[in-house]
């Protein structure tokens, strides 16, 4: 098949473009994307420009799964029309009101939900099936047996299979290029790699029904006036990978009147950000070593302007992309930048043979190892890894200023290459490294302040950078064991805890053993640690013990963070957003009725701040999803 022109604007052959889009779509559905979502969307829009009646644009983009039973859907699972700018959204709203007026409807209600970036599926309570071609999909019910969690329970209809975003970023981002790649692998393969197994053991891969998603509701006028704020609010409340928002008409009679094409429902549109792309040339490749040892490529390119900024460096994510796509010195590449996002390698237009992949670490010269598409330096004492570990400590601890990466690099170069050495430094030591008098004083004071300022013990533990002990899991594990006791626990002790699987337990035991002396040394320095409440000491008689609790709005009796910590001490499971596992939604000031709608739909008890305080202080809550005193 002939290659496409290097510039999207130069593509003029709709049949060739359609063939490439089919190829790109097939790779994407198989969990092995050849180009990014943004680049794919730009190509689809180009096809729409040059051949608006092309068959590809009217067909649902199908996925296939070998050896899976085909299942017909009771109603079509179609794709979604897309809006990349405010004008497209305005035209959609205008069209809706025009169609609604034809049947005498003037009060049209719109809903906006996150557009999850996963694998679309349908759960009827008996069978979990993929979207397929929109009319028939594939039976993947065994995904639930593998460990995929149905949020809100079974039988809630259409939804998306996704990995929890925060978990992916903390534990898997250095092993998979995108969460969707892992999800498709879990669904399509009977043999799972260790990382995918661990994600399933940790209950971090979910089937999320669209009905359980956070949502906004309002008029078309409110949607157009507040679309950016609506989007930001939903992004903050959603811990799943997303590639936009979906705006839908809620009035069933308007939906029925507007109907659908063979490709999408006319009463629904996806709101997506359109990244700006440009073409440049690779001048050099810089290899950077991270805290975990991953050696990642940064492309030094001919300067170009994108989204109002001059781009000189572009991330290429991993060495595998350099090797496979020929993104070496002299290559012509397409770069994309969306808003303030770091510019990324989008596509290699003219490959280069000059893709020399380093065999040794660029910092310590230790032979590198391949881990899937990633290069890794196995040397724990590599200078770059040491610098990044120390920087990670101060960044996560969050109570000591002045220790940026440049300062840390100077400390390590001067021989202060461990936390033990740095925390023994005096003002004179900083002066000896040619820091100025004022900066030396500030650094010495910052060291002392970091010991005396209050810090949560889970944050202290997470700052050591132990694999599989990020902030969330550190908080979780310290609710079972005090920090001092944890250091002596084995993998058997850890695997017995809820939420910790075999692979994670082995990794944590290994990390605690390796860093045990450092952790004990730092504990002996007398940090002002705030202990995590132990589950064994929690008041099981508390009315919120074991309950899922979400706080929203501005609280009067204290900060939301303080109220969340107090709820945890009473045994509650404090959550970020309302789901089917939420029991109570506690609303402070400035929370409108629309924000409580999801809780009502899911049968969650909605309480005002005062009603919540009465509840935990021994009173009985009289509120229910149907009876809310303030809304």
Swiss-Prot record:
<feature type="binding site">
    <location>
        <position position="131"/>
    </location>
    <ligand>
        <name>NAD(+)</name>
    </ligand>
</feature>
<feature type="binding site">
    <location>
        <position position="364"/>
    </location>
    <ligand>
        <name>Zn(2+)</name>
    </ligand>
</feature>
<keyword id="KW-0520">NAD</keyword>
<comment type="function">
    <text>DNA ligase that catalyzes the formation of phosphodiester linkages between 5'-phosphoryl and 3'-hydroxyl groups in double-stranded DNA using NAD as a coenzyme and as the energy source for the reaction. It is essential for DNA replication and repair of damaged DNA.</text>
</comment>
<dbReference type="GO" id="GO:0046872">
    <property type="term" value="F:metal ion binding"/>
</dbReference>
<keyword id="KW-0862">Zinc</keyword>
<comment type="similarity">
    <text>Belongs to the NAD-dependent DNA ligase family. LigA subfamily.</text>
</comment>
<dbReference type="InterPro" id="IPR001679">
    <property type="entry name" value="DNA_ligase"/>
</dbReference>
<dbReference type="GO" id="GO:0003911">
    <property type="term" value="F:DNA ligase (NAD+) activity"/>
</dbReference>
<feature type="binding site">
    <location>
        <position position="382"/>
    </location>
    <ligand>
        <name>Zn(2+)</name>
    </ligand>
</feature>
<dbReference type="Pfam" id="PF01653">
    <property type="entry name" value="DNA_ligase_aden"/>
</dbReference>
<dbReference type="InterPro" id="IPR010994">
    <property type="entry name" value="RuvA_2-like"/>
</dbReference>
<feature type="binding site">
    <location>
        <position position="361"/>
    </location>
    <ligand>
        <name>Zn(2+)</name>
    </ligand>
</feature>
<feature type="binding site">
    <location>
        <position position="160"/>
    </location>
    <ligand>
        <name>NAD(+)</name>
    </ligand>
</feature>
<dbReference type="InterPro" id="IPR012340">
    <property type="entry name" value="NA-bd_OB-fold"/>
</dbReference>
<keyword id="KW-0227">DNA damage</keyword>
<keyword id="KW-0436">Ligase</keyword>
<keyword id="KW-0234">DNA repair</keyword>
<feature type="binding site">
    <location>
        <begin position="79"/>
        <end position="80"/>
    </location>
    <ligand>
        <name>NAD(+)</name>
    </ligand>
</feature>
<dbReference type="InterPro" id="IPR004150">
    <property type="entry name" value="NAD_DNA_ligase_OB"/>
</dbReference>
<keyword id="KW-0464">Manganese</keyword>
<keyword id="KW-0479">Metal-binding</keyword>
<protein>
    <recommendedName>
        <fullName>DNA ligase</fullName>
        <ecNumber>6.5.1.2</ecNumber>
    </recommendedName>
</protein>
<feature type="binding site">
    <location>
        <position position="377"/>
    </location>
    <ligand>
        <name>Zn(2+)</name>
    </ligand>
</feature>
<feature type="active site" description="N6-AMP-lysine intermediate">
    <location>
        <position position="115"/>
    </location>
</feature>
<dbReference type="Pfam" id="PF00533">
    <property type="entry name" value="BRCT"/>
</dbReference>
<feature type="binding site">
    <location>
        <begin position="37"/>
        <end position="41"/>
    </location>
    <ligand>
        <name>NAD(+)</name>
    </ligand>
</feature>
<dbReference type="InterPro" id="IPR036420">
    <property type="entry name" value="BRCT_dom_sf"/>
</dbReference>
<dbReference type="InterPro" id="IPR013840">
    <property type="entry name" value="DNAligase_N"/>
</dbReference>
<feature type="binding site">
    <location>
        <position position="272"/>
    </location>
    <ligand>
        <name>NAD(+)</name>
    </ligand>
</feature>
<feature type="domain" description="BRCT">
    <location>
        <begin position="539"/>
        <end position="630"/>
    </location>
</feature>
<dbReference type="InterPro" id="IPR013839">
    <property type="entry name" value="DNAligase_adenylation"/>
</dbReference>
<dbReference type="GO" id="GO:0006281">
    <property type="term" value="P:DNA repair"/>
</dbReference>
<keyword id="KW-0235">DNA replication</keyword>
<dbReference type="Pfam" id="PF03120">
    <property type="entry name" value="DNA_ligase_OB"/>
</dbReference>
<dbReference type="InterPro" id="IPR001357">
    <property type="entry name" value="BRCT_dom"/>
</dbReference>
<keyword id="KW-0460">Magnesium</keyword>
<dbReference type="GO" id="GO:0006260">
    <property type="term" value="P:DNA replication"/>
</dbReference>
């Amino acid at each position: 098949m002939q290659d496409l022109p290097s510039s999207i604007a130069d593509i003029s052959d709709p049949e060739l473009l359609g063939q490439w889009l089919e190829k790109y779509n097939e790779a994407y559905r198989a969990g092995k994307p050849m180009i990014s979502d943004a680049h794919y969307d730009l190509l689809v829009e180009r096809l729409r420009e040059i051949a608006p009646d092309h068959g590809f644009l009217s067909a649902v983009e199908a996925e296939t799964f070998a050896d899976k039973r085909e299942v017909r859907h009771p109603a079509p699972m179609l794709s979604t029309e897309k809006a990349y700018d405010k004008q497209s959204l305005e035209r959609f709203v205008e069209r809706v009101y025009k169609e609604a007026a034809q049947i005498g409807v003037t009060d049209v209600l719109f809903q906006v939900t996150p557009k999850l970036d996963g694998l679309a599926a349908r759960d009827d309570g008996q069978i979990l099936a993929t979207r397929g071609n929109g009319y028939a999909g594939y039976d993947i019910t065994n995904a639930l047996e593998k460990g995929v969690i149905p949020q809100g329970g079974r039988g809630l209809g259409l939804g998306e299979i996704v990995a929890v975003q925060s978990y992916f970023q903390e534990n898997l981002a250095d092993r998979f290029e995108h969460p969707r790649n892992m999800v498709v692998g879990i669904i399509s393969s009977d043999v799972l790699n260790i990382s995918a197994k661990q994600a399933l053991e940790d209950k971090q891969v979910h089937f999320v029904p669209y009905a359980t998603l956070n949502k906004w509701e309002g008029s078309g006028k409110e949607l157009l006036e507040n679309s950016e704020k609506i989007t930001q609010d939903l992004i903050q409340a959603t811990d799943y990978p997303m590639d936009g928002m979906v705006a839908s008409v809620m009035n069933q009679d308007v939906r029925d009147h507007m109907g659908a094409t063979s490709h999408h429902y006319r009463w629904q549109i996806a709101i997506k950000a359109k990244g700006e792309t440009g073409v440049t040339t690779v001048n050099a490749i810089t290899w950077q070593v991270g805290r975990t040892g991953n050696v990642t490529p940064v492309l030094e390119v001919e300067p170009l302007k994108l989204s109002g900024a001059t781009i000189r460096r572009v991330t290429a994510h991993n060495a595998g992309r350099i090797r496979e796509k020929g993104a070496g010195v002299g290559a012509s590449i397409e770069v994309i930048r969306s808003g303030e996002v770091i510019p990324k390698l989008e596509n290699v237009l003219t490959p280069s043979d000059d893709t020399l992949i380093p065999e040794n670490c660029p910092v310590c010269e230790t032979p590198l190892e391949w881990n899937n598409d990633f290069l890794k330096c196995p040397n724990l004492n590599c200078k770059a890894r040491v610098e990044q570990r120390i920087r990670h400590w101060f960044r996560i601890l969050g109570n000591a200023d002045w220790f940026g990466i440049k300062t840390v690099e100077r400390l390590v170069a001067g021989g202060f290459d461990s936390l033990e050495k740095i925390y023994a430094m005096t003002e004179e030591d900083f002066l000896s490294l040619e820091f100025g008098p004022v900066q030396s004083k500030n650094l010495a004071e910052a060291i002392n302040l970091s010991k005396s300022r209050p810090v949560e013990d889970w944050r202290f533990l997470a700052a050591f950078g132990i694999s599989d002990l990020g902030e969330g899991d550190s908080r979780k594990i310290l609710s079972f064991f005090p920090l001092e006791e944890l250091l002596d626990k084995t993998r058997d002790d850890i695997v017995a805890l809820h939420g910790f699987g075999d692979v994670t337990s082995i990794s944590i035991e290994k990390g605690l053993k390796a860093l045990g002396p450092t952790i004990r040394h730092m504990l002996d320095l007398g940090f002002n640690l705030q202990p995590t409440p132990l589950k064994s000491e929690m008041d099981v008689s508390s009315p919120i013990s074991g309950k899922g609790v979400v706080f929203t709005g501005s609280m009067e009796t204290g900060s939301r963070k303080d109220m969340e910590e107090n709820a945890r001490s009473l045994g509650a499971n404090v959550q970020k957003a309302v789901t089917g596992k939420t029991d109570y939604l506690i609303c402070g000031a400035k929370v409108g009725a629309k924000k409580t709608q999801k809780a009502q739909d899911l049968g969650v008890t909605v309480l005002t701040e005062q009603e919540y305080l009465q509840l935990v202080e021994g009173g009985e809550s009289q509120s229910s999803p149907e009876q809310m005193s303030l809304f």
